[in-house]
Amino acid sequence: CKIHYMKKVFISGISGYIAMHCAQQLLEKGYSINATVRDTKKIDPIKKALKDLSLDVSKIDFFEADLLSDQNWEDAMTGCEDVLHVASPYPLAQPKDENDLIKPAVEGTERVVSLALKQNVRKIVLTSSVAAISSGHTKKQFSEEDWSKVDEPIPAYPKSKALAEKKAWDLINKSNKKTKLTVINPAGVIGPSLTSEVSSTQLIISGLVNGKIPINLPIHIGYVDVRDVALAHVKALESTKSDGERIILSNTELWTKDVSKILRENGYNAPRFSASVAN
């Protein structure tokens, strides 16, 4: 069942790498957007990037809002039929205190989903990650039925994604509202950035090229193009078939040495030597 177009969608954290592509695709389809930014200095670069794609930025209303504060969230969501909750902190390094990452992720999700339920929005699409699915396990294959083991000593990022996503499902399942939830769980996200924002996976690839990662690390992950991730968000909004679903997005998994080989085949300098995996 397809849903009609031309309505207003709320996007949290529009300046982010994935969120910008979501905004592009929604504007191309004629949607209007209410968007949050944590820092208003990002508004002009966002507008410029979207104008450069010949998009009508007058269809975006911006609101300053922080994941850890109630201020402006309700105003930002008013009049929106659907919600894309994309904003979530991600680390460039493991934080000293895991709660620096977990608290804004969980509280931000609780804030957005609770408000969406209060305002009776039709649908929420939440950006999660395969990190919410696979961390802490010894097995090799995963499905949407799996959850990262948050009671095990796993890194802060997968714990933050799993706990935030669980909070969203708990709120939806305990509610008597008709609001539907779909969760998108992408693997390592790569592809062009519309602003200076990048993903942690992109940093690995750029590190292989610029010498900051001089040897192939024993990292084995799946990859997915950011434009496909954004498309999945839009399609989830427009189809009732995705209601109540978690959706993993991943292409073939690759070791870092395989990524380096692809880079070298395309004219880039990338490491030829690999670190061994400890037994």
Regions of interest found by a model, annotated:
Residues 9-31, 36:
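N-terminal Rossmann NAD(P)H-binding glycine-rich loop of SDR-like oxidoreductase domains
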Residues 40-41, 50-107:
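NAD(P)H-binding glycine-rich loop region in Rossmannoid oxidoreductase-like domains
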Residues 85, 89, 95-157:
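Conserved Rossmann-fold NAD(P)-dependent oxidoreductase catalytic core, especially the SDR/UDP-sugar
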Residues 94, 149-154, 195-196, 202-224:
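A conserved pocket-lining segment of Rossmann-fold NAD(P)-dependent short-chain dehydrogenase/reductase
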Residues 152-181:
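Active-site Tyr-X1-5-Lys
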Residues 177-179, 191-204, 236-247:
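Glycine/proline-rich active-site loop of Rossmann-fold NAD(P)-dependent oxidoreductases
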Residues 223, 230-279:
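Mid/C-terminal beta-alpha module of Rossmann-like enzyme folds, strongest
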